[in-house]
Amino acid sequence: MNVILLDKIANLGNLGDQVSVKAGYARNFLLPQGKAVVANAANTEVFEARRADLEAKLAADLAAATQRAEKISALESVVIASKAGDEGKLFGSIGNRDIADAVTAAGVELAKSEVRLPLGAIRTTGEFEVEVQVHTEVKAIVKLSVVAEA
């Protein structure tokens, strides 16, 4: 199924690209979320008329994401207290939701889906640098300090 993208989509294309995707992906994800329209003559004309508006919206989203990333990077070390054993091994783990909640409590809104932990959950005390993907093109680093509860 050929579609015209209305947004930048990772591993697929940019705004205005006409790409061929599987019908299920288009029907169940791209079309309902407003990220694409079916590629036909009428939709192509409508898209070309709206192209400037869509590009301006993308630029505004990118600028807002860049500002959020700067706020996140400007944060001092975010501290999370958790129960731990004598050797610094946590009883449980620190995951995406815990990190997102701690950063939000520190004053910058952050969703758990934006936190990237490629090595899995944090299971020890110490200092960590966690990558946060605010936008497809914008990433930030959060300094995280995991300490044992008294």
UniProtKB/Swiss-Prot annotation:
Provide the protein name.
Answer: Large ribosomal subunit protein bL9
Secretion signal, residue range per the UniProt entry: none
- What's the source species for this entry? Shewanella halifaxensis (strain HAW-EB4)
Q: What is the lineage of its organism?
A: Bacteria, Pseudomonadati, Pseudomonadota, Gammaproteobacteria, Alteromonadales
Gene Ontology biological process terms from the UniProt entry: translation
Give GO terms: molecular function aspect only.
Answer: rRNA binding; structural constituent of ribosome
Key word Ribosomal protein present in the record? yes
Return the GO cellular component terms, semicolon-separated. Answer: ribonucleoprotein complex; ribosome
UniProt xrefs under InterPro entries: Ribosomal_bL9, Ribosomal_bL9/RNase_H1_N, Ribosomal_bL9_bac/chp, Ribosomal_bL9_C, Ribosomal_bL9_C_sf, Ribosomal_bL9_N, Ribosomal_bL9_N_sf
Top-level division of the source organism's lineage: Bacteria
The task this protein performs is described as: Binds to the 23S rRNA.
* Key words of the record: Ribonucleoprotein, Ribosomal protein, RNA-binding, rRNA-binding
Which residues fall in a coiled-coil region? Answer: none
Indicate the family of this protein. Answer: Belongs to the bacterial ribosomal protein bL9 family.
> Which Pfam families does the entry link to?
Ribosomal_L9_C, Ribosomal_L9_N
